[in-house]
C-alpha cells in the first residue's frame, strides 16, 4: 500500500545517553521524543543501544577491569516487557510519532543489541536484534534469531527499516531491505572514535569517519532511501564514567559530531557539529526516490533473480522444543513472548508527561496506521 503521508519532518538524535543509568536513559529518551513531537516530526530516530549507552569501554579495557562495568551495564539494560519500555511507548503515543529506539535488551540472562519501531499509537511494529555482535561486542551481547532480524515495515509514512552499526554495510541485509521496498532507513550507530585515534594495526573502518561519510551514504545510494544515521556523543563526565581506575582518560571531543542524514541519491542533507547535542531535522519527500530508483532499483528492475538470489530463513530455532496439540513442534514469536505486543493502558491526558493537554487529547483520538 502506498504511503498516505509522503512529505513530513523527521529527526535524528545526537545526544549523550544516560551511561549505566536506566532511569536517566528513559527520561532522556522521553525528553527527545517530546522535543521531536513539539517540532512537528512524524519520525524520530535514536542511535544504537542508546539505552543505557554503548559499551565502548569494552574495546579499551581488559577482562578484570570490565567486570564491574559489565555488571552495572547488565543491571541497567532494558527489558522489553517493563514499565520503562511502556513509558517510552506512551511517549510515542502522546506525541503521535514513530520512534526508532536502539537499546540493550535484557531477555532472561542474555543481552541483545535491539531496536524497536514504535507507532504513533504506541504499538511495536518491529522488534529486531543485531544478527551478529561485532568483535568484542560478542563478550557483552548474544546473536539475534530468525524472527528478530527483518526490519522493513509498511507505515503511513512509507516503508521504514532499521539496522545497527556494521549491519549497514552487510550486503545481504541491504539486499533484503531493498527487496522489500524500503523508503526510509534508520542506520543506528554507537559512539565511535575519530580516525586520529587509530593505531597502525587497527583498520580504518573501525573509526567514525568511514562509517559516517562512506557507509551511511553508500546505503542511501544503493537502496535509494532516506538514511537517518544518528550517533551518540559523550562528555568529559561521560568519559570518566566509562573509564575504570588506572586507565587513561581520552579526549571526549575525539568521539563526537558523527551524526548525518542523507537523501535517496546519497547527498548529505544534515551534518552534526562535534559539540551539537539535540535533534537533526530533515524534510522527507518520498517522491524524491523516484529518479534514483528509475536508474537503479536493486530490489526490482536492476537485479537478476534468475542469476542471483538470497535465501532468508525467518524461523526461530528453539533451544528446547515441545510438541504442539497436532503432534508438530511448538514455537513462539519472540516479540510476543517478550511482551512487546502487550497493549498499553488507555491514554492519560492529565499526567505530567511534558505534552500539553490539548495535544494529548488530539493525539489520543488518532487511529493506528500499521499500513
From Swiss-Prot:
It comes from the Eukaryota. Disulfide bonds: none annotated. This is Cyanide hydratase. Residues 326-356 are annotated as: Disordered. Residues 8-286 form the CN hydrolase domain. Its EC number is 4.2.1.66. InterPro entries: C-N_Hydrolase (IPR003010), C-N_Hydrolase_sf (IPR036526), CN_hydrolase (IPR037544), Nitrilase/CN_hydratase_CS (IPR000132), Nitrilases_CHs (IPR044149). Induction: By cyanide. Catalyzes the hydration of cyanide to formamide. Degradation of cyanide may be important for plant pathogenic fungi in infection of cyanogenic plants. Can also transform some nitriles like 2-cyanopyridine and fumaronitrile and has a minor activity with 4-cyanophenyl acetonitrile (4-CPA). One of its GO terms (biological process) is cyanide catabolic process. It comes from Botryotinia fuckeliana (strain T4) (Noble rot fungus). Belongs to the carbon-nitrogen hydrolase superfamily. Nitrilase family. The keyword Hydrolase applies. The keyword Lyase applies.
Amino acid at each position: 500500500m502506498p504511503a498516505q503521508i509522503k512529505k513530513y519532518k523527521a529527526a535524528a538524535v545526537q545526544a549523550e545517553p544516560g551511561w549505566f543509568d536506566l532511569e536517566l536513559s528513559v527520561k532522556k529518551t522521553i525528553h527527545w521524543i517530546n522535543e521531536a513531537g513539539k517540532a512537528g516530526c512524524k519520525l524520530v530516530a535514536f542511535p544504537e543501544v542508546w539505552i543505557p549507552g554503548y559499551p565502548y569501554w569494552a574495546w579499551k579495557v581488559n577482562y578484570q577491569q570490565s567486570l564491574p562495568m559489565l555488571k552495572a551495564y547488565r543491571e541497567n539494560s532494558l527489558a522489553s516487557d517493563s514499565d520503562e519500555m511502556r513509558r517510552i511507548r506512551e511517549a510515542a503515543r502522546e506525541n503521535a510519532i514513530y520512534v526508532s529506539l536502539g537499546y540493550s535488551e535484557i531477555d532472561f540472562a542474555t543481552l541483545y543489541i535491539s531496536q524497536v519501531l514504535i507507532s504513533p499509537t504506541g504499538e511495536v511494529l518491529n522488534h529486531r536484534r543485531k544478527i551478529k555482535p561485532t568483535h568484542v561486542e560478542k563478550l557483552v551481547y548474544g546473536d539475534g534469531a530468525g524472527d528478530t532480524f527483518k526490519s522493513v515495515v509498511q507505515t503511513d509514512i512509507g516503508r521504514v527499516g532499521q539496522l545497527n552499526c556494521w549491519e549497514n554495510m552487510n550486503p545481504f541485509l541491504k539486499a533484503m531491505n531493498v527487496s522489500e521496498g524500503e523508503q526510509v532507513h534508520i542506520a543506528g550507530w554507537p559512539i565511535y572514535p575519530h580516525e586520529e585515534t587509530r593505531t597502525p594495526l587497527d583498520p580504518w573502518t573501525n573509526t567514525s569517519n568511514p562509517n559516517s561519510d562512506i557507509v551511511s551514504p553508500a546505503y542511501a545510494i544503493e537502496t535509494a532511501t532516506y538514511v537517518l544515521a544518528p550517533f551518540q556523543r559523550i562528555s568529559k563526565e561521560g568519559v570518566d564514567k566509562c573509564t575504570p581506575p588506572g586507565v587513561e582518560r581520552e579526549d571526549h571531543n575525539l568521539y563526537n559530531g558523527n551524526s548525518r542524514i542523507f537523501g535517496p541519491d546519497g547527498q548529505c542533507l544534515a551534518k552534526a557539529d562535534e559539540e551539537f547535542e539535540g535533534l537533526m531535522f530533515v524534510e522527507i519527500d518520498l517522491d524524491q526516490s523516484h529518479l534514483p530508483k528509475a536508474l537503479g532499483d536493486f530490489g526490482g528492475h536492476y537485479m537478476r533473480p534468475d542469476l542471483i538470489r538470497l535465501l532468508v530463513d525467518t524461523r526461530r530455532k528453539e533451544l528446547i522444543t515441545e510438541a504442539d496439540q497436532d503432534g508438530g513442534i511448538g514455537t513462539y514469536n519472540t516479540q510476543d513472548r517478550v511482551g512487546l505486543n502487550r497493549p498499553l493502558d488507555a491514554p492519560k491526558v492529565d499526567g505530567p508527561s511534558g505534552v500539553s493537554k490539548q495535544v494529548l487529547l488530539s493525539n489520543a483520538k488518532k487511529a493506528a496506521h500499521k499500513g
